[in-house]
């Protein structure tokens, strides 16, 4: 399955809209987009998962790595548009306490 990825550069953050299934086969596509953003370290990153129908632990691992890299530059990762099902992954793993995870598509 292919992953649909749209990126928008705002003045103070990058917005990444993701659609499809985020798993071991598709995470490398998203990683190609996120790695340069986290290496640059000049903007927060907002990842919108509203159109993601499935995500496994590989996706969680990518977000943990992105968060760590951004935090080194005093920047943050915001995971937005999280469905109830995907939200449970963040809850069960305790990652919801470490990063900004929101069911809405805007940063609160």
Swiss-Prot record:
Reported modifications of this chain: Phosphorylated by RsbW on a serine residue.
UniProt xrefs under InterPro entries: Anti-sigma_ant, STAS_dom, STAS_dom_sf
Pfam families: STAS
Domain of life: Bacteria
Modified positions (Phosphoserine) in chain numbering: 57
Start and end residues of each STAS domain: 3-108
UniProt KW keywords: Phosphoprotein
Molecular functions (GO terms): anti-sigma factor antagonist activity
Role summary: Positive regulator of sigma-B activity. Non-phosphorylated RsbV binds to RsbW, preventing its association with sigma-B. When phosphorylated, releases RsbW, which is then free to complex with and inactivate sigma-B.
Family assignment from sequence similarity: Belongs to the anti-sigma-factor antagonist family.
UniProt xrefs under NCBIfam families: ant_ant_sig
The protein's name: Anti-sigma-B factor antagonist
Naturally occurring in which organism (per UniProt): Staphylococcus epidermidis (strain ATCC 35984 / DSM 28319 / BCRC 17069 / CCUG 31568 / BM 3577 / RP62A)
Chain's gene name: rsbV
């Amino acid at each position: 399955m292919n992953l649909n990825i749209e990126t928008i550069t705002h003045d103070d953050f990058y917005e990444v809209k993701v659609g499809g299934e985020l798993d071991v086969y598709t995470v490398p596509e998203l990683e190609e987009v996120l790695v340069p953003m986290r290496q640059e370290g000049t903007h927060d990153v907002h990842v919108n998962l509203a159109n993601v129908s499935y995500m496994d632990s590989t996706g969680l691992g990518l977000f943990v790595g992105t968060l760590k890299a951004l935090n080194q530059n005093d920047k943050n990762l915001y995971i937005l548009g999280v469905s109830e099902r995907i939200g449970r992954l963040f809850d069960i793993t305790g990652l919801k306490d470490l990063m900004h995870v929101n069911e809405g598509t805007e940063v609160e």
